């Protein structure tokens, strides 16, 4: 049972009776996170005026747990209620510029989705409290600012006077952060679709990605944004350490998302998929299993990872089927000026001239340091910035070898890196 949070000294202020919390602002259109007030969302450019911040958030990196001798009534109640978890994201920046590849998905002349992909995007999970808490406008939990132990809610004993030498608990909203390769699929007209449609399409695409690229279940996960009760976008991210290296293909390959949608329709127990796609008519799809699967089953769309959405998933939804047909027929159109990291093309040519294979499409990260060039089959990675000792140590424990590249490719590829690819 988790007993306390390990609070580093820098988060304590003054005499230790307060914590250095932050207010974060979340875009109500796409779910992007901003630390501080901004005029427009950095991801979708929507106005941020009037957005109510989530106050007093505190990043929690480490906790302490103790063995539980028995399950208490409070434990059972917390499990029964569940926690109100919200997922948000922010795109990485370099020299003040967003490091994002942008594209549109078009079916004919109609744009359906706006896509954004980034390596090492910051994915954050905010724990707002119990789902069935008494006051839904109050977020977070009480914590002892000195010891880090979780404390009782103030409203449980409102009339008890606290002695002056006792530190009062403070309320915080815990937030955990990680960096993952992420793809945002933003519906251009989300109000035109039922929540069941967006939920079904989300899990159909995730299953299609897993099958198309031969991934294990759970390697690619997705979240509806900005919230489960306000589905306007889908955030897909590579959940495994180092990433699977496939989400970037959905942006760079014009027909990759179409292949995924086609595979998803086949997984959903439909025949005559090619005929329906050619005609652009979902009514031509024929149910293969004669009623064995009604709205969804564990052979098609249902899984352990999407249990909260099981009531929404409906493979028989005409709207969901038509959207998947449109996705199978359309193609990706990269936005003007959208490209890979500055300098990557030059290094790709340098690697080729040195006789070593091209790096994977997605980067890897160690200790929050992005390694822009990665060769996963060789467990080798490189970057143009200075390597931290923490990154080297973590990479070494995982069996990776890291290299620092010169600032420009004109200086050539280091001999030590070239030797890693010699038989």
Regions from the PLM with identified roles:
Residues 11-38, 49:
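Inter-lobe coupling/hinge segments of SF2-like helicase ATPases
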Residues 11-13, 242-246, 421-422:
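Short, charged/polar, Gly/Pro-enriched secondary-structure boundary elements
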Residues 28, 186, 235-238, 374, ...:
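Residues in well-ordered beta-strands of folded domains
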Residues 16, 173-176, 371-373:
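Short, flexible, solvent-exposed loop/turn segments with mixed acidic/basic and small polar residues
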Residues 206-210, 214, 259-260, 264-284, ...:
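Nucleic-acid endo/exonuclease domains
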Residues 1-7, 37-338:
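Extended, highly charged accessory segments
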Residues 15-17, 31, 148, 291, ...:
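Intrinsic-disorder/low-complexity loop/linker signature
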């Amino acid at each position: 049972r988790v007993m306390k949070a390990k609070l580093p000294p820098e988060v304590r202020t003054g005499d230790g009776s307060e914590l250095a919390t932050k207010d974060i602002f979340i875009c109500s259109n796409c779910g992007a996170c901003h630390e501080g007030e901004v005029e427009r969302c950095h991801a979708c450019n929507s106005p941020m005026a009037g957005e109510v911040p989530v106050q007093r958030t505190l990043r929690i990196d480490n906790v302490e747990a103790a063995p539980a001798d028995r399950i208490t009534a409070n434990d059972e109640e917390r499990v029964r209620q569940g926690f109100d978890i919200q997922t948000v994201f922010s795109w990485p920046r370099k020299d003040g510029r967003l490091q994002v590849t942008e594209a549109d998905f078009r079916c004919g002349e109609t744009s359906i989705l706006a896509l954004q992909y980034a390596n090492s995007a910051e994915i954050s999970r905010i724990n707002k409290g119990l789902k069935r808490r008494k006051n839904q406008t109050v977020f977070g939990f009480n914590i002892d600012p000195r010891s880090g132990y979780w404390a009782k809610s103030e409203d449980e004993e409102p009339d008890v006077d606290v002695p002056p030498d006792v530190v009062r608990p403070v309320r915080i909203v815990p937030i955990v952060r990680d960096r993952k390769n992420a793809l945002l699929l933003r519906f251009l007209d989300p109000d035109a679709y039922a929540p069941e449609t967006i939920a079904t399409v989300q899990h159909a695409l995730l299953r299609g990605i897993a099958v198309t690229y031969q991934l294990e279940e759970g390697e690619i996960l997705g979240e509806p944004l900005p919230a489960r009760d306000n589905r306007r976008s889908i955030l897909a991210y590579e959940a495994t350490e180092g990433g699977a290296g496939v989400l970037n293909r959905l942006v760079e390959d014009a027909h990759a998302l179409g292949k995924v949608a086609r595979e998803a329709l086949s997984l959903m127990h439909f025949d005559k998929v090619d005929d329906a796609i050619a005609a652009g008519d979902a009514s031509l799809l024929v149910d293969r299993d004669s009623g064995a699967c009604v709205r969804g089953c564990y052979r098609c769309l249902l899984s352990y990872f999407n249990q909260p959405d099981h009531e929404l998933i409906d493979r028989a939804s005409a709207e969901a089927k038509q959207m998947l047909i449109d996705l199978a027929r359309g193609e990706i159109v990269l936005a003007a000026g959208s490209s890979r990291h500055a300098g990557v093309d030059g290094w790709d040519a340098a690697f080729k001239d040195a006789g070593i294979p091209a790096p994977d499409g997605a980067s890897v990260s160690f200790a929050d340091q992005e390694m822009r060039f990665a060769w996963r089959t060789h467990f080798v990675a490189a970057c143009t910035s200075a390597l931290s000792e923490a990154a080297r140590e973590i990479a070494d424990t995982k069996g990776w070898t890291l290299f620092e590249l010169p600032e420009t490719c004109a200086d050539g590829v280091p001999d030590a890196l070239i030797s890693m690819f010699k038989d």
